[in-house]
Amino acid sequence: MQVRTIREQVRAMQRHWPDFVVAEQLRDKVVWFGSLAGLERMYRVMIEYGLPREAAPPTLWRRFPVIRVLSPRLEPNFDAVEEAPLPHVYFTDSDITLSPLCLFDVEAGEWSHNDLIALTTVPWAADWLACYEGWRAIGRWYGGGRHAAIPEEKAS
């Protein structure tokens, strides 16, 4: 499997999402901050991504790009008809409002390290935000997908 370099990912983000700012860039890791529009409001998000490393302890952001909504915070709805308390997220943080978004099924091949984050993950996150706003309004998730299990040791 070919793996895109961090430099390739950064260049693609600059080209397609110029308002996203690189907050940290190392040889094998990058973090961006930027804004995405839902249907009714803007959201400030963070994207964390790292190249896979066999010798390193497994972390979620080395398996795939991790997107968290920073503001406004995700609002849990424990009474939602479906997907309570939050739809399609990975519950890896003690603060569930900062849970990484579940945007694709890695095991089903929906994303790989050869994909450009700017052309896959970011547009999918914008779509997720629109579906999230619908879920907030009616308590049903219309974003599709299935929950991919993340082994506990890979969630850190």
Give residue ranges: language-model regions:
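Compact alpha/beta protein-protein interaction domains typified by the UBC
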Residues: 18-106, 116
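Order/disorder boundary and secretion-linked terminal/linker segments
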Residues: 1-24
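Domain-level detector for trafficking modules
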Residues: 83-156
